[in-house]
Regions:
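Bacterial N-terminal signal peptides that target proteins for export
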Residues: 10-33
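Tandem repeat scaffolds
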Residues: 27-30, 34-186
């Protein structure tokens, strides 16, 4: 017949016998994590601002400066960004659905594969921006500047496409795409 294993005794009255072992293990894990943090093995904060994947849903980002930032896969769904500066920013794969970015600066920004349906881009500047594969149905580009922008494979409402074609010109400096051809202008 097998002998039962010894159960550790607790020094605390009424404590479960395994509680002391769990506390000791938690203490060791905490010490290890603190040691790694102090040694710099675990990065707590990046050296440069990195906002990739941040959720700005339903926030007011008016006049905020995001120029040159990595905002890939970030959500600005329902956000307001009047006169916000996104010049040179990487917004690849971001979500701007139902947002309002009137007079925003997107010069030279990467907006590839962005979901931007039902967005107000009135008066926004897309000079030299890459908008390949965007879904922009129901959006307004009234008065937007699209010189040197690349709209290859973009899904736009026919009304917006025609309006953008009236002002479109140039060649995108990054992709080499002709703006008028990328919009499917006649």
């Amino acid at each position: 017949m097998a002998r039962p294993e010894a159960v550790p005794q607790s020094s605390h009255k009424g404590e479960h016998p395994w509680g002391q072992a769990q506390r000791a293990m938690a203490g060791r894990v905490l010490a290890l994590v603190l040691g790694l943090l102090l040694a710099g093995v675990i990065a707590v904060a990046p050296a440069a601002a990195e906002f990739s994947g941040v959720d700005y849903t339903l926030t007011n980002q008016s006049e905020q400066d995001f120029h040159g930032q990595d905002l890939a896969n970030t959500s600005f769904a329902g956000a307001v960004g009047r006169r916000a500066n996104f010049a040179g920013a990487n917004l690849h794969g971001a979500i701007l659905t139902q947002g309002a970015f009137p007079e925003a600066d997107f010069r030279g920004a990467d907006l590839g594969d962005v979901l931007m349906d039902k967005v107000d881009f009135s008066g926004a500047d897309f000079t030299g921006a890459v908008l390949r594969g965007v879904i922009a149905s129901g959006s307004s580009f009234s008065g937007a500047i699209v010189t040197d922008a690349d709209f290859t494979d973009a899904l736009l409402d026919r009304v917006d496409q025609r309006a953008l074609c009236r002002e479109a010109s140039g060649t995108n400096p990054v992709t080499g795409a002709d703006t008028r051809l990328s919009l499917g202008c006649p």
